[in-house]
């Protein structure tokens, strides 16, 4: 009876080890996929937002300078 328990415990141990290896491989495959994480999405959106703000500030400055020039007639 003891040898049977020992062999079953050994098989359970081997099954657990092989299952953990399968989960690690599956996790590695999922990480290499084309999906973006929330942090990556946030980083991309922050970059796009900063670029848009910079462009808007540049355009706004140009428009304000043109209006000031027209109002003062100093062009």
Curated annotation (Swiss-Prot):
Keywords: Amphibian defense peptide, Antibiotic, Antimicrobial, Cleavage on pair of basic residues, Cytolysis, Disulfide bond, Fungicide, Hemolysis, Secreted, Signal
Pfam families on file: Antimicrobial_2, FSAP_sig_propep
Superkingdom classification of source: Eukaryota
Any Gene Ontology biological process: defense response to Gram-negative bacterium
Gene Ontology CC entries for this record: extracellular region
Subcellular location: Secreted
Disulfide bonds listed in the record: 69-75
Propeptide section residues: 23-40
Signal peptide: 1-22
Listed InterPro entries: Antimicrobial_frog_2, Frog_antimicrobial_propeptide
Tissues expressing the protein: Expressed by the skin glands.
Family: Belongs to the frog skin active peptide (FSAP) family. Brevinin subfamily.
Known function: Antimicrobial peptide. Active against some Gram-negative and a variety of Gram-positive bacterial strains. Active against fungus C.glabrata 090902 but not against C.albicans ATCC 10231. Shows hemolytic activity against human erythrocytes.
The name this protein goes by in its record: Brevinin-2SN2
Species the sequence originates in: Sylvirana spinulosa
Lineage: Eukaryota, Metazoa, Chordata, Craniata, Vertebrata
